[in-house]
């Protein structure tokens, strides 16, 4: 799998679309290079930087999304509000805000860091591996959603009880419970104990 220094600039000499590069990191989250997105997710996977966003409405309900059916990785499954990968050199906070707007057509009214979590989750359905150093963010959303259908097949605001029910019947991303559990202390601080998270 190709690895380049994190400061390298991708180039395309044949006029085709440039490869999407991800930041490879060590176990402490320190950038050690880049790799093409698909190759970083092929078994056994390469540890790379990612982010996960959890946005809540004024009633303390979590916004979840169903990933578009056209995605090559985990299509059609439900997951957290937004997740993705910063561009090499891009701050995870900036990437989280950018991708939330690109996918859902809305900017959070509040977005705060909620820690990091490291995991390795094979996805049997796609044969790919999520080996990520994931930056977590929690926040509030108040504007009307305008999801991009190329990215998002559906959205729902759910209470903890509704999420438990959905999780029992619908397919969720391999990483969903790991990132939600890691973000729970910040979620509780944001939503208050009465919300039940």
From Swiss-Prot:
Belongs to the IPP isomerase type 1 family. This is Isopentenyl-diphosphate Delta-isomerase. The active site is at 83, 132. GO terms for biological process: dimethylallyl diphosphate biosynthetic process; isopentenyl diphosphate biosynthetic process. It is found in: Cytoplasm. Mn(2+) binds at residues 41, 48, 85, 130, 132. HAMAP family: Idi. Pathway: Isoprenoid biosynthesis; dimethylallyl diphosphate biosynthesis; dimethylallyl diphosphate from isopentenyl diphosphate: step 1/1. PROSITE patterns: NUDIX. Its EC number is 5.3.3.2. Mg(2+) binds at residues 83, 103. It catalyses: isopentenyl diphosphate = dimethylallyl diphosphate. Its cofactor is Mg(2+); Mn(2+). One of its GO terms (molecular function) is isopentenyl-diphosphate delta-isomerase activity. Catalyzes the 1,3-allylic rearrangement of the homoallylic substrate isopentenyl (IPP) to its highly electrophilic allylic isomer, dimethylallyl diphosphate (DMAPP). The keyword Disulfide bond does not apply. It holds the Pfam family NUDIX. Residues 46-183 form the Nudix hydrolase domain. Keywords: Cytoplasm, Isomerase, Isoprene biosynthesis, Magnesium, Manganese, Metal-binding. One of its GO terms (cellular component) is cytoplasm. Binds 1 Mg(2+) ion per subunit. The magnesium ion binds only when substrate is bound. Binds 1 Mn(2+) ion per subunit. It comes from the Bacteria. Disulfide bonds: none annotated.
